[in-house]
Amino acid sequence: MKLLQHLTLIFCLLILTACSSRQQQPDNTNWRQQREKLESVTHWTISGKLAIITPEKKGSVRIRWQQNGDDYHLNLTSLLGTRVMEMRKTGEQIVIIDDKGQEYRGTDAEYLVYRLTGWQMPVYKLPMWIKGLPGDTDYQINPNGQVTQIKTAQWQMQYQTYQPVDGWMMPENITFKGQQTELRLVINEWKLAK
């Protein structure tokens, strides 16, 4: 009988110890609020610099991305201002203009970019990831409700810093690491449509 009482007491103590040492989960209220705000932003423009690193090449370009709902206009220029690549999506149609002014059309932006440049870029997910939205992938958030990391099977994103924009906190420095390509995005300016 005494053995049963001792075992019951030890079991209760173990449960109490486990409950008291359990880590507190971060308050996700900040993340829910941040996510709802970001999901409501469907029209925006960013300007900044993009470093593109592949096993064969390393380069840096200026980037201007204008998002209008599901459509976008991406402009990559050299540091001197000459066009490297321009890409427009209107409906299902993708148009890419290269540095020589040659137009390429299709419906698969990632395939067109890879075919023309050799760069693997997650074009379809970029509008969401640039804003700091993980979608249905694994992610980590900080206590302020901002995404610090997103992981997919092909890509891992690190959000180093955020900047205040019209009362919002928007990503400023993001690193995208893929199997063969690394992208480092520094956003100098955000414009959010009201």
Swiss-Prot record:
Primary localisation category: membrane
S-diacylglycerol cysteine-type lipidated residues: 19
Organism: Tolumonas auensis (strain DSM 9187 / NBRC 110442 / TA 4)
Designated name of the protein: Outer-membrane lipoprotein LolB
Summary of subunit composition and partner proteins: Monomer.
Gene behind this protein: lolB
Subcellular location: Cell outer membrane
Classification via InterPro entries: LolA/LolB/LppX (IPR029046), OM_lipoprot_LolB (IPR004565)
Record's bilayer topology term: Lipid-anchor
PROSITE patterns assigned to the protein according to its UniProt record, in alphabetical order: PROKAR_LIPOPROTEIN
Its biological purpose: Plays a critical role in the incorporation of lipoproteins in the outer membrane after they are released by the LolA protein.
GO BP: lipoprotein localization to outer membrane; protein transport
GO cellular component terms attached to this protein's record: cell outer membrane
Keywords: Cell outer membrane, Chaperone, Lipoprotein, Membrane, Palmitate, Protein transport, Signal, Transport
UniProt lineage: Bacteria, Pseudomonadati, Pseudomonadota, Gammaproteobacteria, Aeromonadales
Lipidation (N-palmitoyl cysteine): 19
SUPFAM superfamilies: Prokaryotic lipoproteins and lipoprotein localization factors
Residues making up the signal peptide according to the UniProt record: 1-18
Domain of life: Bacteria
Sequence similarity: Belongs to the LolB family.
Membrane in keyword set: yes
NADP among keywords: no
